[in-house]
Amino acid sequence: SAGFKAGVKDYRLTYYTPDYETKDTDILAAFRVTPQPGVPAEEAGAAVAAESSTGTWTTVWTDGLTSLDRYKGRCYHIEAVVGEENQYIAYVAYPLDLFEEGSVTNMFTSIVGNVFGFKALRALRLEDLRIPPSYSKTFQGPPHGIQVERDKLNKYGRPLLGCTIKPKLGLSAKNYGRAVYECLRGGLDFTKDDENVNSQPFMRWRDRFLFCAEAIYKAQAETGEIKGHYLNATAGTCEEMIKRAVFARELGVPIVMHDYLTGGFTANTTLAHYCRDNGLLLHIHRAMHAVIDRQKNHGMHFRVLAKALRMSGGDHIHAGTVVGELEGEREMTLGFVDLLRDDYIEKDRSRGIFFTQDWVSMPGVLPVASGGIHVWHMPALTEIFGDDSVLQFGGGTLGHPWGNAPGAVANRVALEACVQARNEGRDLAREGNEIIREACNWSPELAAACEVWKEIKFEFEPVDKT
């Protein structure tokens, strides 16, 4: 038979191409590959390239009907991971034609699809992706971005302050709205629905939206500042999600929220388009991310999920804290914080960035620091995250001994003190505690907060330092 030989052949014969020069239009991926014993690194890397692009386990005669050279993924470089036995970084280049325009869903179905269950691999982790401008330009991206958000809110020169309303489940809509009002009245910019607040028997979504809108307008009238509450529009169907977003728009509130991993990228992109068309900001929560990103040798690093979110669309996204209860190693966290905010990010392996990423004109996303943080953390957070961030204190506001509003006052005073000290040229890292103590002298609310949280630390070694 001419030109076709049935049977199984090594992937590396076709898909391992160390001489390949990557194109500007290729999507590049860096995989951490742990081959099964006896499987050579080149074969494992080639298998990843094949199974996430055009390959299948055997030769098929329909290969002759297309141009493999044009469409196949290529493993173009492999390097051993220093300090790890039998772990390699395999670099794979994918031709742009393999992916549907404007669909994170399709991109992930290929790149992190079936290949993760592949038998020749003991484990596989996607560490980073390089998205070429020729692909990122097919996405709308964030509904508004950092600059437009500041203009909408009329807040400049400092991080924004938020608070998740607790207890996360069980409050009635009226009491929930009351808690929102107190926090906003005290000086916060935003309050937040918890990620698992959708529309449960104790509080249906429409009631919550109404009482929260009332709280926002009352707090705005009293403070003269623009306020917001992240109304969680996440729902069981896309239609229901959009219905909730429409109601939020009708109420005239500035921002809604979505759980982008549990809701899914298709739903998220749908909502992001609606938000841009209707002037709503979109806050993104990353519930379920640790299922995907916490294992060091398998899954996907959060920096990839963060890039995907910037493409799919969101104006805020949770990004760990570096200092609180939820995990985050400083350099790695700052690496993907930059990937969210900046236009152009240089390759820097010490920060986990495997590829130079050029977002061209795609708007940036505000990173949200949230989880176990309180007033004593304020200098570190201001120093680490800078102005373009949202600092979110849940228990750190509502746990104040005098109530929610004084808790909000304490956080706002601490933030303003840190920003002023920084602008005066003081060193927040060294003088942080002193700056907070000085501010306590003219804010009894802050003094009370400092007393409550003076000893609390979450001291665990982070799991993932890579």
Swiss-Prot record:
InterPro entries in alphabetical order? RuBisCO, RuBisCo_large_chain_AS, RuBisCO_lsu_C, RuBisCO_lsu_C_sf, RuBisCO_lsu_fd_N, RuBisCO_lsu_N_sf, RuBisCO_lsuI
Q: Which SUPFAM superfamilies match?
A: RuBisCo, C-terminal domain, RuBisCO, large subunit, small (N-terminal) domain
Q: Which reaction does it catalyse?
A: 2 (2R)-3-phosphoglycerate + 2 H(+) = D-ribulose 1,5-bisphosphate + CO2 + H2O; D-ribulose 1,5-bisphosphate + O2 = 2-phosphoglycolate + (2R)-3-phosphoglycerate + 2 H(+)
What EC number(s) does this enzyme carry?
A: 4.1.1.39
What residues make up the catalytic site? Answer: K166, H285
| Binding-site positions, substrate | N114, T164, K168, R286, H318, S370
Query: Which enzyme type, at the first EC level?
Result: lyase
Where in this protein does the record say N6,N6,N6-trimethyllysine is found? Answer: K5
Q: Which residues carry this modification: N6-carboxylysine?
A: K192
Give the UniProt record's GO annotations in the biological process aspect.
photorespiration; reductive pentose-phosphate cycle
Q: Which GO terms describe its cellular component?
A: chloroplast
Tell me the function of this protein: RuBisCO catalyzes two reactions: the carboxylation of D-ribulose 1,5-bisphosphate, the primary event in carbon dioxide fixation, as well as the oxidative fragmentation of the pentose substrate in the photorespiration process. Both reactions occur simultaneously and in competition at the same active site.
- Family to which this protein belongs: Belongs to the RuBisCO large chain family. Type I subfamily.
UniProt miscellaneous comment: The basic functional RuBisCO is composed of a large chain homodimer in a 'head-to-tail' conformation. In form I RuBisCO this homodimer is arranged in a barrel-like tetramer with the small subunits forming a tetrameric 'cap' on each end of the 'barrel'.
Name of this chain's protein: Ribulose bisphosphate carboxylase large chain
